[in-house]
Amino acid sequence: MEFKQGDRVRIEKNGTVYEGKVMPSMEGYITIKMNSGYNAGFSMDKVKITLLENNGENTNGGLNGGKEHKTAGEEVQKSGKKLPKVAILSTGGTIASKIDYRTGAVTSQFTADDILAAIPELREIADFKGRVISSILSENMDSESWQNLARAIVEEIEAGADGVIVTHGTDTMMYTAAALSFMIETPVPIVIVGSQRSADRPSSDNAMNAICAALVAISDIAEVSVVMHGTTSDDFCEIHRGTKVRKMHTSRRDAFKSINSRPIGIVDYNTRKIKTFIDYIKRGERPLKFNPGMEPKCALVKFTPGSGPEILDHYIDSGYRGLVLEGTGLGHVSTKWIPKIQKATDAKMPVIVTSQCLNGRICDRVYDTGRDMLKAGAIEGEDTLPEIALVKLMWVLGQTDEFNEAVKMLREDISGEITKCCFK
């Protein structure tokens, strides 16, 4: 039978019928993307294949499993109600992904307007303005991407937005959340949201996450937060502070957890009510401030038993301006590393120490190794997560070239990254 990629076919095997679009396949096999969003592969000599007449675009895709909606550039009808104004900025990632029915691949092609069209409930919550900042997978984000995004957010707030939602890939969401937390002092909510499962999948979390994010965007929580599923069920989303959140699972819908802190609160998906657990900065409490400076030449180095101290030589000799060490337990590295820490600080490179344990607080005053690290100039990261410490270091070095001032700032709690007492 003659068929090509993107053709719609029916496959019969052992009395069971499968329908879908043809994907790239190995010789002798056929792989299809079924309407459910799942892939199925078959040996061609063991099945009956029928080419279907309807080879147009699939009408079972889209973000909500229904008809595909308007794509980039097409206007989405605005709500006539007087609702809060919320800007939704798209950067790509799974929440902005859809199936390319020609190849069956998942691509970041949906825009903010597409998301709004596909989740009509959003229009009952706020009057949205959609804007595409980028269409990339989150592993391709960098400090320049964070700065561009932050500038766009500030522009929307200055233009009168009552809240801002950023759609983002989940893999590096915590880095972006931290960067925005340090760069922007905001008078309105800035909410980062994504999804673990692409929109074509029946188990996609995108719609619920987006609705919960919209509710936070019109709330009085004037901080940078991450809003994602709180459990594997569709019952509530958690609101995580942007400097206390971490992705803790590769694929679960409730992958994001607040570390060393409780979440700011939760959004009940059924009642649409928000319940808060900790103090937070309220809407209008502080004026808008924007400090976008970032120093990209910083590194996070994980210590492992037996790893040689010459690792640090590479960064020191290559012109890096700061280091974060992810040590063991209370924040330790081999004693062989201590002279290299001294070499770095002598070169005016701040060195922050964090823990691989994630939960708990650094204390380098208990054992001799830790005390020697402090004598060499290491800075205790307190209960800051390693990844957040890296972003903080990049931001601080983007604000000052003066070593002592940088050290002073790194020891301070700037945006909730250091807490007085760790959550147990």
UniProtKB/Swiss-Prot annotation:
The encoding gene: gatD
Keyword Protein biosynthesis attached: yes
Listed Basic and acidic residues bias regions: 66-78
Occurrences of domain Asparaginase/glutaminase (ranges): 84-406
Sorted UniProt keywords: ATP-binding, Ligase, Nucleotide-binding, Protein biosynthesis
Biological function: Allows the formation of correctly charged Gln-tRNA(Gln) through the transamidation of misacylated Glu-tRNA(Gln) in organisms which lack glutaminyl-tRNA synthetase. The reaction takes place in the presence of glutamine and ATP through an activated gamma-phospho-Glu-tRNA(Gln). The GatDE system is specific for glutamate and does not act on aspartate.
Protein name in UniProt: Glutamyl-tRNA(Gln) amidotransferase subunit D
Regions that span the bilayer: none
Disordered: region residues: 58-79
Catalytic activity: L-glutamyl-tRNA(Gln) + L-glutamine + ATP + H2O = L-glutaminyl-tRNA(Gln) + L-glutamate + ADP + phosphate + H(+)
UniProt GO MF annotations: asparaginase activity; ATP binding; glutaminyl-tRNA synthase (glutamine-hydrolyzing) activity
Keyword Protein biosynthesis: yes
Active site: T94, T170, D171, K247
Top EC group: ligase
